[in-house]
Amino acid sequence: MKGRFGRFGGQYVPETVMNALIELEREFEEAKKDEKFMEEYRYYLKEYSGRPTPLYYAENLTKRLGGAKIYLKREDLNHTGAHKINNVLGQVLLAKRMGKKRIIAETGAGQHGVATATAAAMFGMECEIFMGEEDIKRQALNVFRMKLLGAKVTAVTSGTRTLKDAVNEAIRDWVTNIETTFYVIGSVVGPHPYPTMVRDFQRVIGDETKEQILEKEGRLPDYVVACVGGGSNAMGIFYPFIEDKGVKLVGVEAAGEGIETGKHASAMAKGSVGVLHGMMTYLLQDEEGKILPVHSISAGLDYPGVGPEHAYLKEIGRAEYVYATDEEALAAFMDLSRTEGIIPALESAHALAYAMKLAKKLDEDKIIVVNLSGRGDKDVNTVAKVMGVEL
């Protein structure tokens, strides 16, 4: 069935949204086959975002841990500081192709909002970003950044006032303004065609990584490790390696204060199958199917679900999903900053925390690639607060 990954995915949406999804899928399929569109997309990735991003051998870190070689895929070096721009450029170009005048998006950490506002500014489109009131408090800098870029930021005060509520609000707006408006989803979530479309715009990460590691090591890595919230950075780096059975794919979720505390965001470890935001996937929900509150030190990972293709990769055993706590992520954040002079996003620090544990157990001839999905500038306030430092 179309838009399904095994039993996951699908289009669990009201009739009103269905027509928009059908139109979107048609346009996306056509655009993908259109060499001119793809050429324009690649042009902006290179000239505007600065791709390809380096695959960096973290020599200091590797030597200190004394195990497997650690390479970092430097998505933090993209324009706007994370992998988000890869997908946003693709979707905004698609919106332009479809003749839409207005761009809307949801955002949690604010990174996807900033990337969307950035692309909208460049293409001269009106932009509105929906953001949970709680997240607005946590991410004041990103909120101001979006406003600087000309976007309107709308606070969402319903529900838990976080990412999931922002998504609901954005969908509501989209349905009302379908003629003029394009909804840019920031992760491999939502109803079909979004999970596929976002993956296709993010796979550039894995395509580059494959080429780069072959050039540097003459072989593929033993492990590819990435953090998973919705899971677009992970899907982007995993996808080109799926057929390479010798490469182990590891997604790292946020265990928050601990997987047994109820204050975490590990849908794979603790969730059950259900429907949210138009897709069937693993969700953190109670017996009645009510979505549970989630927690992570990193705003970008506190999503109560996970992309349906990840759910499928877990089910067929092609990828493994583990988790790292707030504390472990913080330690990795500090570690990379001091060892390599790279301040990672707290999201990426979850992947790094697991990779560091893993590296110690492996022989020196093994290779681990970690997707460093974003830079940590946005998290400096959070980390300072945890350390009791007044800024």
UniProtKB/Swiss-Prot annotation:
Keyword Lipid metabolism attached: no
- Provide a GO CC annotation, any one: cytoplasm
- The enzyme class is lyase
Known EC number(s)? 4.2.1.20
Q: Name one GO molecular function term.
A: tryptophan synthase activity
Q: Which UniProt keywords apply?
A: Amino-acid biosynthesis, Aromatic amino acid biosynthesis, Lyase, Pyridoxal phosphate, Tryptophan biosynthesis
Q: What is this protein called?
A: Tryptophan synthase beta chain
Species of the source: Caldanaerobacter subterraneus subsp. tengcongensis (strain DSM 15242 / JCM 11007 / NBRC 100824 / MB4)
